């Protein structure tokens, strides 16, 4: 089976993106895996520190490994938004394929210093592991928000992206380009969409020349996602849309079967609801547009 790095290289060459979907339990993992397998699309599942605390670090690593080995399918595991080196080391030792080391709330120079140290430590522990760094401000919480925070001052510049990549040695970069964690109530209702700064993505990519990840993509305009991928995004993170689909599927199942107490008779509708969202996103991410600056 191809390595995660090789799969990212192929996505980069074809100007398509790999889908990354956060999971919290077996229901969401099952849905993401089935959708990806149906489409024969490589996929990454991610768990934040909170999600890992609930599902278990070693437990989620074992589940993903079992799917990959039993079905010989390229599903990979990411330790999403890991805020401490100890937590990153725990995930690396458990067998995670990728670590998002996120200390982006710190001043830039301190972010560089800590991320560089994390890269060195994690690569010494597991030379094959991928490490991502984050710069800029994209808010916090894959939840439903009443209003959008003002993130304009936290947008990533091409110059700082290049400096960050050069000084830290990260494998992938998560910039702030108009993206935002979570969704607004108006987005959930279908009345508004997130819009991205496509020219900023293109400019950051041209300077950093590295795999780039779009975090906080739930609720983003479809055309903007296509353009963002064409401009240089190699990975796209979806979490809030997965959570919404899980809740809607579960609510629908319980409404139809109010007296049902058997989990395996209720949960399949939540699986199907999440699966539909994941399949639609994977199909969108796999549509290439045009050539973009290569990763060196």
Regions found by a protein language model. Give the residues of each.
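Alpha/beta enzyme core
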Residues: 2-10, 14, 26-51, 57-76, ...
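Short amphipathic alpha-helical segments at helix-loop
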Residues: 17, 103, 262-266
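Thr-Gly-centered strand-to-loop micro-motif
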Residues: 214-216
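C-terminal alpha-helical cap/extension of soluble enzyme domains
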Residues: 221-296
